[in-house]
Amino acid sequence: MAAGQDRAMPHPVLIIAHRGASGERPEHTMLSYQRAIDQGADYIEPDLVPTKDGVLVARHENNIADTTDVATHPEFAARKATKTIDGETMTGWFTEDFTLAELKTLRAKERLPQLRPGNAAFDGQADIPTFDEIIALAKRASAANGRMIGIYPETKHPSYFASIGLPTDARLVAALKAAGWDRADAPVFIQSFEVDNLKRLKAMTSVRLIQLMAATGAPADHAASSYAAMATPAGLRAVAAYAYGIGPDKAMILPAIPGAKPTALIADAHAAGLKVHPWTFRAENIFLSPDYRVPGTPATHGRIEDEIRAFIGYGVDGFFTDYPYKGASARASALAAAAERGKD
């Protein structure tokens, strides 16, 4: 197989369902992942954190106060705690203080009910899924749909979890090996905002690795001076020594100012041999690049498909979206337009 070829996927631009179809269902639930699959996502994205007994589960962060009904469970009131994680102090309930059996008694709820009231209608209908359950869903859905549906796990706060005796890298690799998905051509990407854990993972697995980059700040493990430095041509060449691609904030490609022009990041990454999967394409005005907003409220859906088409035109290799069906529509029209131009 040629280097960089994705044998498992039929499309040149991948649709990655960000926390599932999180624009229409509460994030990181089986409801959200199934919705994403039904809408044509190529990959579903579980963020992974460990339980007290070392099981990987899908939550965007280990503080579950905002995404579950834990606050309504009097039996867990005493678990409320204040912790400092990656330099940020927060109060809530944390996955590492619950066994899997205890977490399974909780129910998920919508993170952004003011922006997405329709999602809140599904509050209480889903539990917190394990990584193994998500892998099983992807495999079942692949067989049922006759197309490969991959997974795109992110290791959340790996340095923090290692510091409290719950390292996640080996658990993640073990789950992939058990699934038979520990290969370079498996329908899997592993992503992280940190650097050293990706380097460790490179020694542990041949699965493709993605270095995430934020528009500001630096990796929590202090392995690089800043994400901005990592996004320079020299920084990207260093990333290419251990990663298959990068997952930058979309504002690193198109600055979040009116009339912005795209940066050189995609071209520089491609020159270093890296794929580019930016995040996150969301339909609501508040999240759109300024030129793609429409009159209305922050919750009003703007021109997300135009925004995605623009980024496909810039040369991205995939993209994260909360709305996979809009991503699928945008990709189809962009590829059709490109094919039409190719006839000229």
Which residues does each PLM region occupy?
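Phosphate-group recognition and catalysis centered on beta-loop-alpha active-site segments
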Residues: 1-344
